[in-house]
Each structure stands twice: as C-alpha cells, then as structure tokens.
C-alpha cells in the first residue's frame, strides 16, 4: 500500500517560528508521515516522516491553549493548535500510528542522530507505556471504589426489603392465628436465589479470529478513546483501554460496515424508536482486519473511496507471492547493492550498539515495574469481574423481591 495514502485530516493552525505567527491549514496523517498543508495556497509547509519523530506531547501555548507539539530529529519542535474536532482525538490517532510504526519497523532507528540513541528512544517509549499503565491503575482503583459503593447500596436495599417482607407477613397474618407470624410459606421464595443464579451464567468462550488496538469513537467524532477491536467467529466486540467491554455486535445484528479507508471503518446496528448504535474505529492494523470482515460480512460491508486501494494491494501482494514461488531458474535477475550509501547504511546499522549497560538496567527496572503493574491490574480486573457478577445477581434478586412484594401489597389493598 502506498505510503501517501491518507489516514485522516484535521483543520488546525501551525506556528511559524521565523515569522512569529499562526497559519491556518490542514494536518494530514499518512501511514508513514505527517504533513501540514496551508489552507490558502495548498502548499505543503511541513512534512515529517513518522520514523523521524522523537516525541509527541500535549502542551499549552501562552496565546492559544490546547496544542500538540512534535519533536523531531535535530531537536526541531513543531506546534499545532486549534485542532478540530478536539486535541485529544488528533493526539490519540497520531500517537497510535507513530507507536505502531516504531514497534513494527525497528530498523528505522538506524537513522537516529548520535545524541539520541536507540536505547534512549526505547526508554522513552517504555516510560510512556508505564505512565499509561499507572493512569489505568488509578482509573481501576476509582472504578473499584464505585463498585464497592454499589455493593453496599445493594446490601442496604436487601436489608430494607427483608424488613418490608416481615411487615407484609405481619399484615397478611390473621388476628385469630395462634402460631405467630408464619402463616403462609411462599414456595417461590425458597428457589429464588437458585433461579437467579441459574439465569446469570456467563456465555461460553468463542473463537477469537483477530484482536487489534484501535482508536474508538461512538457517534460524536469529538470524543475518542483508546481500545481494541476483537473479531470473533460469530460477533464483533469493542473494548476500552481497561479491557472492559463497551459493546458486542452479534453477527446477525450488524446492519452495515463502511470502510472509509484501509485504516478506518464504521460499524452500525439500526434500531426502531431509539438511536442507532454506531462505532468508528481507526487502527494501523486495520488492513489485516478488513479482509476478514469482507468474508464474514460480505453482504453488509461497503468499500468507500480510498478503501478500494486495499483490494489493489491484495492483488499486488498475491502477484508478488506468485513471482516468489517460481523456480530459481525463472526468477528475474535482481542486482544487489555493491556499496554506496545503502552499503554504508547497513554497515552503520551493524556497528551501532542497541543500548548501553546503564540503559539496559533502566529498561530492566521499567519492565519489572510494568510487570508488577500488569499483575496487579489483572488481579483487580478479576476481582471487579467477580464484583460485577455479584451485582448482577443482587440486582436480579432485588427486582424479583420488589415485584413479589408489590403483588402482595396489591392483595392487601
């Protein structure tokens, strides 16, 4: 696929350091570069390969707040502001493609200048990942406190329902009955908890076809979040960054899937009398998912505009595989580089060390912290899953109790 394929474009302003002014235009992201095009002249004012970017940050300007800064080789810093629809949306998409490129193409680090080694870049990447995991752990802690408060509220509700049950039993007991308040015994009451628990059994495990990280937005494009898309044999599942299920599309419930580009798809489920459920997903790994969606949802998927290039890529790759499978005698002659710039670059890449001992120790410390955070997060998620199961059972039991007591009160009236 061509590296000039547009992933997304956003309206924004770029700061010209020499002229000390902001210029309006469009920020365009491709799979391997970031470009800023001036609105009036349509001139490409800035063109940055993603492999040359060292750092992407969210910062604030003294004059225009809410900016994104991009630091490239040579310590050149670029400012982008007035981002539409929002700064967070643009930042999430750009950072996602930048990270995926760094992880999938480690050889691009050979061009890093001498003052920024590959080890330093890897440390920065791992430090950002550690910060994200720490933020996720804080969010999980807050979520755990909310679940605990919900459980306490349900326990209080259950005790109140027990009091109401005793009062109703007193009211239902005739004054001439000499054996206390135990007059009628409700047979349904004995098997109440058993019936609720039997209806709350979890779904069986399904075969996972593929799972990819993605930027997720629901209806409003101005709000997006990090997450992942999981393609199952009989469904599509969308999760947030904490691996909590946002929505599950059963295969028969999906009404249409639109492929806006090889990196962007939208999934919709229509309803009558209430808003449709629609999600828009952007991912650097989406070209691996679209062929699977075409097979599973052949009658519901629609390729739009630039997405047609994806099929051309499939045909081209199949032709390349066919050519590679020819016998050696039929393989066309191909000259190998015999020196020059390519040979020097390969030799430089071999001689350049990956990282020093100090950087290796720092990476080891970061990885050990991330391992501990991952284990704590996994344990917390399991605890919250159990808490959610308990909440589900308690809510169903409370609902049945309320319905039963409402019927008893109607009989007394």
Curated annotation (Swiss-Prot):
Identify the tissues in which this protein is expressed.
Ubiquitously expressed with the most abundant expression in the brain. In brain, most highly expressed in the glomerular layer of the olfactory bulb, the cortex, striatum, hippocampus, and colliculi (at protein level).
Write out the GO biological process terms. Answer: exocytic insertion of neurotransmitter receptor to postsynaptic membrane; long-term synaptic potentiation; vesicle-mediated transport in synapse
List cellular component terms (GO): dendrite; endomembrane system; glutamatergic synapse; hippocampal mossy fiber to CA3 synapse; membrane; neuronal cell body; perinuclear region of cytoplasm; postsynaptic density
- Alphabetically list the UniProt keywords: Coiled coil, Cytoplasm, Membrane, Repeat
Read off the Gene3D superfamilies from this record. 1.20.5.110, Pleckstrin-homology domain (PH domain)/Phosphotyrosine-binding domain (PTB) (2.30.29.30)
Chain intervals for the UniProt region annotation (Disordered): 321-342
Q: Which residues form the t-SNARE coiled-coil homology domain?
A: 109-171, 350-412
PROSITE patterns, from UniProt?
T_SNARE
Subcellular location as annotated: Endomembrane system; Cytoplasm, Perinuclear region
Q: What is the first-listed, main subcellular location in coarse terms?
A: membrane
What is its biological role?
Answer: May play a role in intracellular membrane fusion.
Q: Cross-referenced PANTHER family, in alphabetical order? A: SYNAPTOSOMAL ASSOCIATED PROTEIN, SYNAPTOSOMAL-ASSOCIATED PROTEIN 47
Which family does the similarity line name? Belongs to the SVAP1 family.
Quaternary structure per UniProt?
Associates with the BLOC-1 complex. Interacts with BLOC1S6. Forms a complex containing SNAP47, VAMP2 and STX1A.
Name-wise, this protein is Synaptosomal-associated protein 47
């Amino acid at each position: 696929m061509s590296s000039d394929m547009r992933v997304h474009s956003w309206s924004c302003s770029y700061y010209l350091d020499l002229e000390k002014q902001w210029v309006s235009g469009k920020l365009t992201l491709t799979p391997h570069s970031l470009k800023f095009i001036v609105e009036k002249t349509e001139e490409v004012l800035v063109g940055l390969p993603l492999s040359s970017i060292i750092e992407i940050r969210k910062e604030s300007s003294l004059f225009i707040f809410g900016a994104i800064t991009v630091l490239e080789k040579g310590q050149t810093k670029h400012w982008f502001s007035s981002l539409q629809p929002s700064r967070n949306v643009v930042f999430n998409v750009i950072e996602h493609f930048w990270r995926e490129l760094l992880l999938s193409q480690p050889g691009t680090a050979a061009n890093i200048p001498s003052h920024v080694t590959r080890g330093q870049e890897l440390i920065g990447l791992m430090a950002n990942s550690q910060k994200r995991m720490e933020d996720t752990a804080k969010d999980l802690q807050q979520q755990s406190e909310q679940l605990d408060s919900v459980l306490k509220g349900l326990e209080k509700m259950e005790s109140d329902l027990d009091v109401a049950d005793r009062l109703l039993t007193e009211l239902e007991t005739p004054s001439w009955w000499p054996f206390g308040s135990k007059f009628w015994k409700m047979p349904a009451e004995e098997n109440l908890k058993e019936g609720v628990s039997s209806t709350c059994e979890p779904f069986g495990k399904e075969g996972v076809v593929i799972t990819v990280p993605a930027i997720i937005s629901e209806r409003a494009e101005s709000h997006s979040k990090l997450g992942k898309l999981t393609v199952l044999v009989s469904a599509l599942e969308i999760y947030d960054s904490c691996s909590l299920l946002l929505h599950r599309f059963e295969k028969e419930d999906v009404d249409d899937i639109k492929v806006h580009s090889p990196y962007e798809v939208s999934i919709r489920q229509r309803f009558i009398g209430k808003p449709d459920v629609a999600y828009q997903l952007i991912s650097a790994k989406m070209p691996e998912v679209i062929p699977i969606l075409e097979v599973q949802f052949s009658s519901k998927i629609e390729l739009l505009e630039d997405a047609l290039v994806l099929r051309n890529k499939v045909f081209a790759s199949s032709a390349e595989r066919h050519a590679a499978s020819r016998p050696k005698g039929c393989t066309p002659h191909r000259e190998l580089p015999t020196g020059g710039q390519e040979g020097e670059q390969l030799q430089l890449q071999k001689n350049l060390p990956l990282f020093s001992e100090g950087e290796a120790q720092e990476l080891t410390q970061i990885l050990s912290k991330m391992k501990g955070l991952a284990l704590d997060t996994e344990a917390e998620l399991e605890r919250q899953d159990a808490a959610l199961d308990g909440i589900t059972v308690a809510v169903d039991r409370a609902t049945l109790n309320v319905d039963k007591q409402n019927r008893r009160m109607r009989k007394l009236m």
